[in-house]
Amino acid sequence: FPAMPLSSLFANAVLRAQHLHELAADTYKEFERAYIPEGQRYFLQNAQSTGCFSEVIPTPANKDEAQQRSDVELLRFSLLLIQSWLGPVQFLEKAYANELVFGTSDRVYEKLKDLEEGIQALMRELEDGSPRAGQILKQTYDKFDTNMRSDDALLKNYGLLSCFKKDLHKAETYLRVMKCRRFVESSCAF
């Protein structure tokens, strides 16, 4: 992110987060369509709702809770969520090498790195300007399993994609809340 006005930094970060969240949601839906029998979807979705690693990070659960946090806190949460996926996403391409729909996974990593840099640029702007070492995650998500013939691998990857979608939704929400707080505009209703 080159030097630019704060409003542009926020606008770019929100657009990137929104795009990644849409990509994660589309990938999840496509995986579900391709691999999960329709009769099992509801049961499996409920079973995975508590299995996300990010739930151990004390992040705001919704927009109202996010509005009660400072911008710097929300940026830190967003950064932690993004960084927790940098490693696992690199295995998406390997897990789905022969699947056309998952062919964008190599770009997902680049897009996550780009969003990470954007969030770090916002943190530098909002803090005292000096780069601070962020909280380093000792634990992240498991890698995606490349053995697509195994039911266990399918269920694991389905759960990971569900968490990926949820975490990117959180990061997008936090960035939107901050942007709307600072720059009131018509697109703040979400």
Curated annotation (Swiss-Prot):
Please verify whether the record's keywords include Phosphoprotein: yes
Residues recorded as bearing Phosphoserine in the entry: 105
Q: Which GO terms describe its biological process?
A: animal organ development; growth hormone receptor signaling pathway; positive regulation of growth; positive regulation of receptor signaling pathway via JAK-STAT; response to nutrient levels
Q: Give the record's family classification.
A: Belongs to the somatotropin/prolactin family.
Q: What compartments host this protein?
A: Secreted
In Pfam terms, one family for this protein is Hormone_1
Give the principal location in a single coarse category: secreted
Disulfide cysteine pairs (residue numbers): 52-163, 180-188
Region forming the signal peptide: none
CDD domains in UniProt = somatotropin_like
InterPro entries, A to Z:
4_helix_cytokine-like_core (IPR009079), Somatotropin (IPR034975), Somatotropin/Prolactin (IPR001400), Somatotropin_CS (IPR018116)
Q: Please list the residues that bind Zn(2+).
A: 19, 172
- What is the protein name for this chain? Somatotropin
Mind telling me which PROSITE patterns this protein's record contains? SOMATOTROPIN_1, SOMATOTROPIN_2
From the Swiss-Prot or TrEMBL record, what is one GO molecular function term?
growth hormone receptor binding
Going by the UniProt record, its keywords in alphabetical order are: Disulfide bond, Hormone, Metal-binding, Phosphoprotein, Secreted, Zinc
Q: Which GO terms describe its cellular component?
A: extracellular space
> Which domain of life does the protein's organism represent?
Eukaryota
State the gene name recorded for this protein. Answer: GH1
**Is this entry keyworded Phosphoprotein?**
yes
